[in-house]
């Protein structure tokens, strides 16, 4: 089966079409802007899969309708998913703009005095606004000389932010969300909303009963040689934690081996269902070998599966990590309890950063006073105002232990193409696999247990659906916190100590939901959240605006908020603008 090509970035150099001196004097400068933009993007960006980003430049500068149409024909044949229009001069606004209604688009108007690039930028954006096709504005803060071919830092930041978000939009379009099972324990996020995926993300939902997973395991619809490799890898790398079950519920060695085997098989079969596996065709399973073209998935698990079969914790944790028995590779996006809305937040974070995502319960707010009462310890530093306990039995990527290191030796989570095998091994070494608690998981299983290193910047996100409004996005930038071991142990043993933990301290602003840490917890819209490495809330905001998803809560500095220029016409408060603009334009793929 032919591999689906990755979306490309289209670069549209536009120019003043007047011949006999004007156009001729601008051709080289205009095309050089396009080439410089393409060079920047190809150097600084990668797709989430790790592949290099490709740019497609119009064959000629665009002065009017004919050249715009020729450019569009080229872009259509090359899978261009977003466009950047560049110019150093006046051009003919509505005659030269990109009119595709769903493709993210930006315009960079050169800030120079010789020719009025800013005037074209304003005219073109006015046309976009009038026609209901929002576009992003890029205009340098400082005047440049006409022969200056450099890209200023503020322009570069906007070009890269737009491109990261635009690539995420283009990469999700046409893919599917694999809903493996149904609603888990009444969790609203697992009431999978097909209209949301279709209208806002351009995706389909593939609904598959969990009996399909059972069928694949029982009928050996998998690569048996790979299973043996996975078992050998687990035997070498898995460290097992204590079994906290009562004696009558503890499994013997043979039973535990069967649980491990099935857990690894679940990982293999869910992966094969998502992306396909050509080796299944070799054993006569051609239909199953194709997969479901899923860029994200969710597994219901509880309780209809987990009351009799091993839970999804091991499978989910390994799939969401950047490595397994096949080595370092791109992490998958698999939401525990089939929480599709948390899965979408995971998908956004992965597409923007190329990193694994940490799925967690937003479990407990610990005030400084409560911690001091329980442990005698007084919080300080990043934790001085209190912390949130992020913990879940399921799909927290092992990368979340933060045993990888950045260029300065700090703990982090890297894009998978930067992770060494030694760093993957360190994450595995920092993880214990604890037998699942019988009261929760009667069919057994293994839960990963690790503790996230402290001082690491994270962005916590969540998508919620509000009746009458549609989807909204929540964002909270902050840091992981490291507590003294005895303090962590006391707090952790008050909940389920066999699960992975991140102690999270959001950055406070003193206003609204970020007045204090309690307010962050109180305003969080659901029981789950996602941790993405770094303070990348601004990228989430830009991506959300492209999809027409308003942001209902964030602590990103106002100077970093970057949305289409038409948002400014929807009022004077930037967050109110966001709601009104998203309502006005409606979902990106209106249905």
UniProtKB/Swiss-Prot annotation:
Pathway: Carbohydrate degradation; L-fucose degradation; L-lactaldehyde and glycerone phosphate from L-fucose: step 1/3
An annotated Gene Ontology molecular function: L-fucose isomerase activity
Entry GO CC: cytoplasm
Keyword list, A-Z: Carbohydrate metabolism, Cytoplasm, Fucose metabolism, Isomerase, Manganese, Metal-binding
Cofactor: Mn(2+)
GO biological process assignments: D-arabinose catabolic process; L-fucose catabolic process
Listed CDD domains: L-fucose_isomerase
Catalytic reaction list: L-fucose = L-fuculose
Enzyme class: isomerase
Parts of the chain that traverse the membrane: none
Record-linked HAMAP family: Fucose_iso
Function field: Converts the aldose L-fucose into the corresponding ketose L-fuculose.
NCBIfam families in the cross-refs: fucI, PRK10991.1
Oligomer status and interactors: Homohexamer.
PANTHER family recorded: L-FUCOSE ISOMERASE
Name of this protein: L-fucose isomerase
Gene transcribed to yield this protein: fucI
